[in-house]
From Swiss-Prot:
IV repeats lie at residues 1523-1821. Changing A239T: In DRVT; borderline phenotype with spike wave activity in some patients. The gene is SCN1A. Pore-forming subunit of Nav1.1, a voltage-gated sodium (Nav) channel that directly mediates the depolarizing phase of action potentials in excitable membranes. Navs, also called VGSCs (voltage-gated sodium channels) or VDSCs (voltage-dependent sodium channels), operate by switching between closed and open conformations depending on the voltage difference across the membrane. In the open conformation they allow Na(+) ions to selectively pass through the pore, along their electrochemical gradient. Glycans are attached at N211, N284, N295, N301, N306, N338, N1378, N1392, N1403. It comes from Homo sapiens. This is Sodium channel protein type 1 subunit alpha.
Length: 2009
């Protein structure tokens, strides 16, 4: 941060780069080299200085540097970045202030930076026109590339392009140098692209390389150059590359999972898809054809005779496709299988494996690669229903399980993981950008502080002199006046302005006293305010300022925070930077240019000079005469502008008056700029305005009574007008003359009469009721447009036409009236009005051109009116905003996507275009190009777009068939992976991030009400008033209810008092001011008068206040502190606020923040009881019932009442008993199961039918009994207030009704039959019984409101497309077909309907038919759009649309080709946006619900939460007892070998190799290969058996304590058995090879050992964590499928078999229904299942067809039921369940990522315990201190402590128990602490771990630590010190003693003395030696117990002390 401040910013920081500069740099480099000759590279990179990110090449120069002096533009300058101070670089700045950085070394060894040629090259390079030229060239080039057969002259154009690119590269190379230094040509990866493109251009030109088209495709890469030219794109591409890097782990995991699944598929289905139905026995003709002559020699009675025998050739017969069974309209023969549940062959055919695989032979499981492709297709869910149906038909229905696993684990999980990863990458990048921006902001603040200090210092003297002359009006003013005086950035104009002001001030100081106040006021307002260029930001990011007065850097300096925050204030901004509670509006609300820079937030907000203001801001009658104040009134305030104007166009001033500082002028009380509600368009009546204004402030009376003050206040209007004019001018985008023009012509205020008219019009048009009426008109108009259909009667058509005219008239009138009321100038200042104007104009144009052909499209523009609803519909508004936002953010992304699509489209066209033309007969029987080909650019584009939609497999088959497999696979996979996965997911990530909880919750800004709400509100008030009057009238007639009247009266009194006391103290505040609005519009007013006595609500009414909307409660607030200032509006925005306020009242809390008066507490506080399981029944009836019907009240103390009570208690006990509940659940399951038997065959199975009928009765009686018991036990009140009970009740009712009907013999009635189908709802009762499902359902119900809201918005959105579709295609899909072949007649034969009718008259084979799913009316339009949005059945609709010509005309092939675009646009907006919006809403909703539930997962029950938490922290593991090492020597050796890691890894490698050999298997391999593989397999079996045996030997019976071992054992046994009994097992069971695949799961164990696999571990961990929740969702999905299956069986069992319904996939039996429904869960193939159900009358179906074995007649479907069935199922399963899946996975993925990002993960703890086992074999949980050092070294990072580590361990202060042992938790904890560092969290973690440990180890040895390692060390050291001191003391004593003895014995003989002396010296030496050894021992920190005795240390020291003493003596 400091670096940026080093170079003083400002214009004088630029210096030319000269030879001297270069010499200086070289000198600096030399100095540095001399200083440190060997720089340590690594260290330098880490901590060294980094380049400044703001001064990177390519970025724009930060404005802090000011303007570049003109002579320095495009010239070499010294580098500004301090990082490059000793690097040979220089920079060049162009006019646009972009930075270019060059190397200062010689380019190409010859051109120095000062060479004129290089200088010219640099000038060209940095010029903006140069990049423009290149850009245009690239775009033109792209246009030429899209030509499929370019004419000859394009060759020259090619040369031109190549020439321009060569010129560009040469310029770059000359300017930059080629490749050696930094910043040279090849150092930029984007230039590599250029280089290769140019090289290829020359190579292909001069060298003949054969296949040119492949090389020509390289030219396409030029399109990528656009990315390098447009700056914003580079960042997006950066983001893409980032997300791809992040995806690497997911990709590995995906490939791994797919491989495993592919292997399983290979083993299960190898060769199955080649089973065909072959005609058998063969006919005579075929016998002859396939017989071969063979000459054989027969020994006939010993004579050899040559005979010719005809032998049947079986092989050639089965390969001949003529004898295969084909269904009509299918390319491939019908598949079949030999198992009982597989597809069966028709009569006369048998099932044989022959011929090729389906789909040109590309769909199969015959080899690993094809199986992998099939699984990839399954994962991406493209046309997977086809694969599913083929496989089930060939292998059997049981294999549905395989698909369920793949779809749920593979598809949903992996695809969503990709989404999660991309979203997180995006999120991280956003976070980084934000942090960077905040850091910049901080740096900027710092710079400003610095400047400020410098300037203040420079100003000190000047200020001193100035202050003698003039007293400044405000401190703030003085500060800022001086502050920018000496600023480098201060521009000339600003200085002039200051001088002018100074002169003026001096003048005023001298002569101002005599001047009249008002006149001064005028000069102040006119001059000073006018001249200070008001800065003001629009949408927080366009910083505009007055050009005439200030230069850019001057005013930019004054923008305090908003510099780096584009979109800071827009509500929809993805991330808010820093919430400022007080600033509602734009950053610098009214801040003056110079007054806002250096004050802090608070003072800045008061910095506008204006006198105090009058209470009423403007008087309505004055307003019409003074132009300026009117301008103030209607200054538009749309949502985008953070202006000072509230929603009525009135400046709102909030805050009390400030005390005048001097008579000269005073501060305007803080001006808050209210950001008006986006939905408001300034249309509010005068009274509403006044009301709102009055609610904005509260001024004391004495202030207004002072005449001079009032006089001055009157001029406020003019001043504010000036302010507003300033604001206007500050936003000027056009030259002033335009403004002059608009003032004259566009603001109409010529005559007073006109103004009166205008006033009246204003009153009318701006009234909320008018708004309401207009909204109703919009809705009606939409309805009218939606009523168009085909065929329509003339009368109906006329009604619609007239209606359209009327509505057009109404909207036109509205527009003109608004223009009159607002003046054109202001009318068009607002977005909504422009929108209205646009639509009205279009409608008028369309009326004029109504009869012109081809312009009917204009009618579609009328649909945009629907969007006007957004004004008053917040969610729609939000959706549009999110789309707008995303499109803003997506602008660049869309460009990248467009470039990718373009490149691939061109590549496809260049590579495959010719092949499609040449080999077309391979894929089309009539040798015409199919609809999907790549022969021209448009079709190629469509194919790429289709791939992006996720449909790639079918077009890829065609491509592979015509152009070869390898190329097609590569291209399609690239489009798929790059385009689909990455870009679409980035798209999703953007959508998700533009969603944030507050978007949905608080859609209304600032609690503003829009006019619609006001109008509705008024109506509510009116109704409430009428109600109350009637109520009072009734009450007067019934005195019985006098009590209620008494309640209401004081309330009314309070209201009246409120008004009177209020108006006494404030300047005109609206009378009908409401604070708390009830839902029903009744208000709880808030009284203000200290005289008002508390109104105490008694308890019952206290509750009824909440429940009874017509009871108003007044809550007094003391006058002085009412919260008026803070309330801008009188209404709460949404019911949620209301709920909150209700809750507040409910809690009897104070009603106003500062209020001294509370709501009276209820007389008795109701104790809130937790609803525990009470053992007594509750009351039978509600209190209301008991009051009305006295008979309901029973005395339960005596007589019959008591018996009744006892009965109830008995029932209660029964119902509450666990067994009762279990029994009922069992019954529910049984009865649901019984429903599954009622299929198509029920009539044939008489016994089952009879049983079911009886069972049904029994179940019904049981359920009725249960219901009665519950009624008696719980009482009606409890029973009927529980939603689950209601569900039970209704379902029992259905059974009861159908039972009764059966008994009475009405069972065949239609109504009863349909009622019987409702029995399918029975399983729903299971919901409330299973907690897992109930949890999910509750979560879903919580999400329903917002899901419905979005659903509605999507419906509106789709409505537009649907109506447009009706306009474009209604009646045009009819076509004439030949009923025998089913083909369409050619347009030559049949041109229109009449031709077709003629054909029908002549012969019967023709038919004029419509496509089943069409656009004939809006309803069908919706259905068609749903098919397009789910990409199922959309082809037929698109083909019909593309072929359509006109109503009643026969369609023609690709007649209106560009109708494809309608679908493309719909897919982008209708499908991508809206469907992804669902995902957004659901995820968002669940996050909100999680917050509500305290952050717990809402899909899990308590039990599962426990499992989840256990998974989350395995810290709860206890040290396990390891398997003891066997005593036997041989066994011991084997044990050591088996338990080594190497052994595990080698086994792992063997498993992988085994997999590889399995992958090599193919279906048609030779005998030789088969034998080799079986031998290899044998080897593996031997090896695995060996492993098994070894482990058994070494581990003994412990072998079976480990799950994996048991699994291995089983696999080995099966393999051995399988070798001998292979045929037998395969016949009855699954092939045993399958189990080997499952062994791959063992890889999971190895992942822990691989360091690099951390990411994959995280992903698997996320999956493990998601499992419980996913299981619940799966359960719910199963329940939904079950119910729908039963329903489908009862409704669609007999429909005609066609399209998607056939002998295997139908609704005839329960199993088949489930198979179909599972397929539709991913919305696959639902169009095929729906099509037969749409047949409702002949000739499509036969209503009288007899179904054998059943009484039901006909095979027609019921279209309405069918559509409802499928659409509801798709919405429930696809949108809800699948998206819940996504939500769970995203959630857990982020949790898992956070976990893995933590320094310590589960694995580390696990590893700790694994190592622990080796050191503590008996699992005592303790370890001796001396082992600790080795243990710490044996751990793996991050926990390990490499040796030597003794001192560190001692310093850890570990608690020890007797025997010098330390507990494992203490060690783990200390190590953890070392990794994480000290923090408050550590203590929490410690407690948590201990609790967990205690819980998981009840056997935990309770221990009391005696000491700690540190204490022990301290004790040792102290002991040593004591010893030393004592020895020293001893020595002294000895010496003393010796000398004494010596002196004493001096007299005695000398020999004796010598002996003594020796003794003393010995004694001294001895002492010092022990001291030395002691020292070494302690410093080496040997294990403290020297004698290795585990005695407590104290004893030991005592003992040692005694020894010493003994020695001493």
């Amino acid at each position: 941060m400091e670096q940026t401040v080093l170079v003083p910013p400002g214009p004088d920081s630029f210096n030319f780069f000269t030879r001297e500069s270069l010499a200086a740099i070289e000198r600096r480099i030399a100095e540095e080299k001399a200083k440190n000759p060997k720089p340590d590279k690594k260290d330098d990179d880490e901590n060294g200085p980094k380049p400044n990110s703001d001064l990177e090449a390519g970025k724009n120069l930060p404005f802090i540097y000011g303007d570049i002096p003109p002579e320095m533009v495009s010239e070499p300058l010294e580098d500004l970045d301090p990082y490059y101070i000793n690097k040979k670089t220089f920079i060049v700045l162009n006019k646009g202030k972009a930075i270019f950085r060059f190397s200062a070394t010689s380019a190409l060894y010859i051109l120095t930076p000062f060479n004129p040629l290089r200088k010219i090259a640099i000038k060209i390079l940095v010029h903006s026109l140069f990049s423009m030229l290149i850009m245009c060239t690239i775009l033109t080039n792209c246009v030429f590339m899209t030509m499929s057969n370019p004419p000859d002259w394009t060759k020259n154009v090619e040369y031109t392009f190549t020439g321009i690119y060569t010129f560009e590269s040469l310029i770059k190379i000359i300017a930059r140098g080629f490749c050696l230094e930094d910043f040279t040509f090849l150092r930029d990866p984007w230039n590599w692209l250029d280089f290769t493109v140019i090289t290829f251009a020359y190579v292909t030109e001069f060298v003949d390389l054969g296949n040119v088209s492949a090389l020509r495709t390289f030219r396409v890469l030029r399109a990528l150059k656009t990315i390098s030219v447009i700056p914003g794109l580079k960042t997006i591409v950066g983001a893409l590359i980032q997300s791809v890097k992040k995806l690497s782990d997911v990709m590995i995991l995906t490939v791994f999972c797919l491989s495993v699944f592919a292997l399983i598929g290979l083993q299960l289905f190898m060769g199955n898809l080649r089973n065909k139905c072959i005609q058998w026995p063969p006919t005579n003709a075929s016998l002859e054809e396939h017989s071969i002559e063979k000459n054989i020699t027969v020994n006939y009675n010993g004579t050899l005779i040559n005979e010719t025998v005809f032998e049947f050739d079986w092989k050639s017969y089965i390969q001949d496709s003529r004898y295969h069974y084909f269904l009509e309209g299918f390319l491939d023969a019908l598949l079949c299988g030999n198992s009982s549940d597989a597809g069966q062959c028709p009569e006369g055919y048998m099932c044989v494996k022959a011929g090729r695989n389906p789909n040109y032979g590309y769909t199969s499981f015959d080899t690993f690669s094809w199986a992998f492709l099939s699984l990839f297709r399954l994962m991406t869910q493209d046309f997977w229903e086809n694969l599913y149906q083929l496989t089930l038909r060939a292998a059997g229905k049981t294999y549905m399980i395989f698909f369920v696993l793949v779809i749920f684990l593979g598809s949903f999980y992996l695809i969503n993981l990709i989404l999660a990863v991309v979203a997180m990458a995006y999120e991280e990048q956003n976070q980084a950008t934000l942090e960077e921006a905040e850091q910049k902001e901080a740096e900027f603040q710092q710079m400003i502080e610095q400047l400020k200090k410098q300037q203040e210092a420079a100003q000190q003297a000047a200020t001193a002199t100035a202050s003698e002359h003039s007293r400044e009006p405000s401190a703030a003013g003085r500060l800022s006046d001086s502050s920018s005086e000496a600023s480098k950035l201060s521009s000339k104009s600003a200085k002039e302005r200051r001088n002018r002001r100074k002169k003026r001030k001096q003048k005023e100081q001298s002569g101002g006293e005599e001047k009249d106040e008002d006149e001064f006021q005028k000069s102040e307002s006119e001059d000073s305010i006018r001249r200070k260029g008001f800065r003001f930001s629009i949408e927080g990011n366009r910083l505009t300022y007055e050009k005439r007065y200030s230069s850019p850097h001057q005013s930019l300096l004054s923008i305090r925070g908003s510099l780096f925050s584009p979109r800071r204030n827009s509500r929809t901004s993805l991330f808010s930077f820093r919430g400022r509670a007080k600033d509602v509006g734009s950053e610098n609300d009214f801040a003056d240019d110079e007054h806002s820079t250096f004050e802090d937030n608070e003072s800045r907000r008061d910095s506008l000079f204006v006198p105090r203001r009058h209470g009423e801001r403007r008087n309505s009658n004055l307003s019409q005469t003074s132009r300026s104040s009117r301008m103030l009134a209607v200054f538009p305030a749309n949502g985008k502008m953070h202006s000072t104007v509230d929603c009525n166009g009135v400046v709102s001033l909030v805050g009390g008056p400030s005390v005048p500082t001097s008579p000269v002028g005073q501060l305007l009380p803080e001006v808050i700029i209210d950001k008006p509600a986006t939905d408001d368009n300034g249309t509010t009546t005068e009274t509403e305005m006044r009301k709102r204004r009055s609610s904005s402030f509260h001024v004391s009376m004495d202030f207004l009574e002072d005449p001079s003050q009032r006089q001055r206040a009157m001029s406020i209007a003019s001043i504010l007008t000036n302010t507003v004019e300033e604001l206007e001018e500050s936003r000027q985008k056009c030259p002033p003359c335009w403004y002059k023009f608009s003032n004259i012509f566009l603001i109409w205020d010529c005559s007073p009469y006109w103004l009166k008219v205008k006033h009246v019009v204003n009153l009318v048009v701006m009234d909320p009721f008018v708004d309401l009426a207009i909204t109703i008109c919009i809705v009606l108009n939409t309805l009218f447009m939606a009523m168009e259909h085909y065929p329509m009667t003339d009368h109906f058509n006329n009604v619609l036409t007239v209606g359209n005219l009327v509505f057009t008239g109404i909207f036109t009138a509205e527009m003109f009236l608004k223009i009159i009321a607002m003046d054109p100038y202001y009318y068009f200042q607002e977005g909504w009005n422009i929108f209205d104007g646009f639509i009205v104009t279009l409608s008028l144009v369309e009326l004029g051109l109504a009869n012109v052909e081809g312009l009917s499209v204009l009618r579609s523009f009328r649909l945009l009116r629907v969007f006007k609803l957004a004004k008053s519909w917040p969610t729609l508004n939000m959706l549009i905003k999110i789309i707008g936002n995303s499109v803003g953010a997506l602008g660049n992304l869309t460009l990248v996507l467009a470039i990718i699509v373009f490149i691939f489209a061109v590549v496809g066209m260049q590579l495959f275009g010719k092949s499609y033309k040449d080999c077309v007969c391979k894929i089309a029987s009539d040798c015409q190009l199919p609809r999907w080909h790549m022969n021209d650019f448009f079709h190629s584009f469509l194919i790429v777009f289709r791939v992006l939609c996720g449909e790639w497999i079918e077009t890829m088959w065609d491509c592979m068939e015509v152009a070869g497999q390898a190329m097609c696979l590569t291209v399609f996979m690239m489009v798929m992976v790059i385009g689909n996965l990455v870009v679409l997911n980035l798209f999703l990530a953007l959508l998700l991030s533009s969603f944030s909880a507050d978007n949905l919750a608080a859609t209304d800004d600032d609690n503003e009400m829009n006019n619609l709400q006001i109008a509705v509100d008024r109506m509510h008030k009116g109704v409430a008033y009428v109600k109350r009057k009637i109520y009072e009238f009734i009450q007067q007639s019934f005195i019985r209810k006098q009590k209620i009247l008494d309640e209401i009266k004081p309330l009314d009194d309070l209201n009246n008092k409120k008004d009177s006391c209020m108006s006494n103290h404030t300047a005109e505040i609206g009378k009908d001011l409401d604070y708390l609005k009830d839902v029903n519009g009744t208000t709880s007013g808030i009284g203000t008068g200290s005289s008002v006595e508390k109104y105490i609500i008694d308890e019952s009414d206290y509750m009824s206040f909440i429940n009874n909307p017509s009871l108003t409660v007044t809550v007094p607030i003391a006058v002085g502190e009412s919260d008026f200032e803070n309330l801008n509006t009188e209404d709460f925005s949404s019911e949620s606020d209301l709920e909150e306020s209700k809750e507040k009242l409910n809690e009897s809390s104070s009603s106003s923040e500062g209020s001294t008066v509370d709501i009276g507490a209820p007389v008795e506080e109701q104790p809130v009881v937790e609803p525990e399981e009470t053992l007594e029944p509750e009351a039978c009836f509600t209190e209301g019932c008991v009051q009305r019907f006295k008979c309901c009240q029973i005395n339960v103390e005596e007589g019959r009442g008591k018996q009744w009570w006892n009965l109830r208690r008995t029932c209660f006990r029964i119902v509450e008993h666990n067994w009762f509940e279990t029994f009922i659940v069992f019954m529910i399951l049984l009865s649901s199961g019984a429903l599954a038997f009622e299929d198509i065959y029920i009539d044939q199975r008489k016994t089952i039918k009879t049983m079911l009928e009886y069972a049904d009765k029994v179940f019904t009686y049981i359920f009725i009994l249960e219901m009665l018991l519950k009624w008696v036990a719980y009482g009606y009140q409890t029973y009927f207030t529980n939603a689950w009970c209601w569900l039970d009740f209704l379902i029992v009712d259905v059974s009861l009704v159908s039972l009764t009907a059966n008994a009475l013999g009405y069972s065949e009635l239609g109504a009863i039959k349909s009622l019987r189908t409702l029995r399918a709802l029975r399983p729903l009762r299971a919901l409330s019984r299973f907690e897992g499902m109930r949890v999910v359902v509750n979560a879903l119900l919580g999400a329903i409101p917002s899901i419905m809201n979005v659903l509605l918005v999507c419906l509106i959105f789709w409505l537009i497309f649907s109506i447009m579709g009706v306009n474009l295609f209604a009646g045009k899909f009819y076509h004439c077909i030949n009923t025998t072949t089913g083909d369409r007649f050619d347009i030559e034969d049949v041109n229109n309907h009449t031709d077709c009718l003629k054909l029908i008259e002549r012969n019967e084979t023709a038919r004029w038919k419509n496509v089943k799913v069409n656009f004939d009316n809006v309803g069908f339009g919706y259905l068609s759009l749903l098919q397009v949005a789910t990409f199922k059945g959309w082809m037929d609709i698109m083909y019909a649309a593309v072929d359509s010509r006109n109503v009643e005309l026969q369609p023609k092939y690709e007649e209106s080709l560009y109708m494809y675009l309608y679908f493309v646009i719909f897919i982008i907006f209708g499908s991508f946006f809206t469907l992804n919006l669902f995902i957004g809403v659901i995820i968002d909703n669940f996050n909100q619900q999680k917050k509500k539930f305290g952050g717990q997962d809402i899909f899990m029950t308590e039990e599962q939460k426990k499992y989840y938490n256990a998974m989350k922290k395995l810290g709860s593991k206890k040290p396990q007892k390891p398997i003891p090492r066997p005593g036997n020597k041989f066994q011991g050796m084997v044990f050591d070998f088996v338990t080594r890691q190497v052994f595990d890894i080698s086994i792992m490698i063997l498993i992988c190799l085994n997999m590889v050999t399995m992958m090599v298997e193919t279906d048609d391999q030779s005998e030789y290969v088969t034998t080799i593989l079986s031998r290899i397999n044998l080897v593996f079996i031997v090896l695995f058996t060996g492993e098994c045996v070894l482990k058994l030997i070494s581990l003994r019976h412990y072998y079976f304590t480990i799950g994996w071992n048991i699994f291995d054992f089983v696999v080995v046994i099966l393999s051995i058995v399988g070798m001998f009994l292979a045929e037998l097992i395969e016949k009855y069971f699954v092939s045993p090879t399958l189990f080997r695949v499952i062994r791959l799961a063992r890889i999971g164990r190895i992942l822990r050992l691989i360091k690099g696999a951390k990411g994959i571990r995280t992903l698997l961990f996320a999956l493990m964590m998601s499992l419980p929740a996913l299981f619940n969702i799966g359960l719910l999905l199963f329940l939904v499928m079950f119910i729908y299956a039963i329903f489908g069986m009862s409704n669609f069992a007999y429909v005609k078999r066609e399209v998607g319904i056939d002998d295997m996939f139908n609704f005839e039996t329960f199993g088949n229904s489930m198979i179909c429904l599972f397929q539709i869960t991913t919305s696959a193939g639902w169009d095929g299942l729906l099509a037969p159900i749409l047949n409702s009358k002949p000739p499509d179906c036969d209503p009288n067809k007899v179904n054998p074995g059943s009484s039901v007649k006909g095979d027609c479907g019921n279209p309405s039921v069918g559509i409802f069935f499928f659409v509801s199922y798709i919405i429930i399963s696809f949108l809800v369940v699948v998206n819940m899946y996504i939500a769970v996975i995203l959630e857990n993925f982020s949790v898992a990522t956070e976990e893995s990002a933590e320094p310590l993960s589960e694995d580390d703890f696990e590893m700790f315990y694994e190592v622990w086992e080796k050191f503590d074999p008996d699992a005592t949980q303790f370890m001796e201190f001396e082992k600790l050092s080795q243990f710490a070294a044996a751990l793996e990072p991050p926990l390990n402590l490499p040796q030597p580590n003794k001192l560190q361990l001692i310093a850890m202060d570990l608690p020890m128990v007797s025997g010098d042992r330390i507990h494992c938790l203490d060690i783990l904890f200390a190590f953890t602490k070392r990794v994480l560092g000290e923090s408050g969290e550590m203590d929490a973690l410690r407690i948590q771990m201990e609790e967990r440990f205690m819980a998981s180890n009840p056997s935990k040895v309770s221990y009391q630590p005696i000491t700690t390692t540190l204490k022990r060390k301290q004790e040792e050291v102290s002991a040593v010190i004591i010893q030393r001191a004592y020895r020293r003391h001893l020595l002294k004593r000895t010496v003393k003693q010796a000398s004494f003895t010596y002196n004493k014995n001096k007299i005695k003989g000398g020999a004796n003395l010598l002996i003594k002396e020796d003794m003393i010296i010995d004694r001294i030496n001895e002492n010092s030696i022990t001291e030395k050894t002691d020292l070494t021992m302690s410093t080496a920190a040997c294990p403290p117990s020297y004698d290795r005795v585990t005695k407590p240390i104290v004893e030991k020291h005592e003992q040692e002390g005694k020894d010493e003493k003994a020695k001493g003596k």
